[in-house]
């Protein structure tokens, strides 16, 4: 996931970024360009984003659950 994020950050155009995820057949795209959110810096600027933070968040929750089971 880190390599994908790095490649996505290096992409300069939307087509280049979209191609990062097309190498895998039957899988979703790894990254995409989207506009920033309100309250963030430069909300109108398109930025290359990927979903790897969701994987990291899910992994952190799994580790937390596992550690809480060890407490019993």
UniProtKB/Swiss-Prot annotation:
<keyword id="KW-0449">Lipoprotein</keyword>
<keyword id="KW-1003">Cell membrane</keyword>
<keyword id="KW-0336">GPI-anchor</keyword>
<dbReference type="GO" id="GO:0098552">
    <property type="term" value="C:side of membrane"/>
</dbReference>
<comment type="function">
    <text>VSG forms a coat on the surface of the parasite. The trypanosome evades the immune response of the host by expressing a series of antigenically distinct VSGs from an estimated 1000 VSG genes.</text>
</comment>
<keyword id="KW-0821">Trypanosomiasis</keyword>
<dbReference type="GO" id="GO:0005886">
    <property type="term" value="C:plasma membrane"/>
</dbReference>
<dbReference type="InterPro" id="IPR019609">
    <property type="entry name" value="Variant_surf_glycoprt_trypan_C"/>
</dbReference>
<dbReference type="Pfam" id="PF10659">
    <property type="entry name" value="Trypan_glycop_C"/>
</dbReference>
<feature type="propeptide" description="Removed in mature form">
    <location>
        <begin position="51"/>
        <end position="72"/>
    </location>
</feature>
<protein>
    <recommendedName>
        <fullName>Variant surface glycoprotein MITAT 1.1000BC</fullName>
    </recommendedName>
</protein>
<keyword id="KW-0325">Glycoprotein</keyword>
<feature type="lipid moiety-binding region" description="GPI-anchor amidated aspartate">
    <location>
        <position position="50"/>
    </location>
</feature>
<keyword id="KW-0472">Membrane</keyword>
């Amino acid at each position: 996931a880190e390599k994908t994020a790095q490649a996505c950050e290096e992409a300069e155009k939307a087509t280049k970024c979209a191609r990062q995820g097309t190498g895998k057949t039957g899988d979703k795209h790894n990254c995409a360009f989207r506009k920033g959110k309100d309250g963030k810096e430069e909300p109108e600027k398109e930025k290359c984003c990927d979903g790897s933070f969701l994987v990291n968040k899910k992994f952190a929750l799994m580790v937390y659950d596992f550690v809480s089971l060890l407490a019993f």
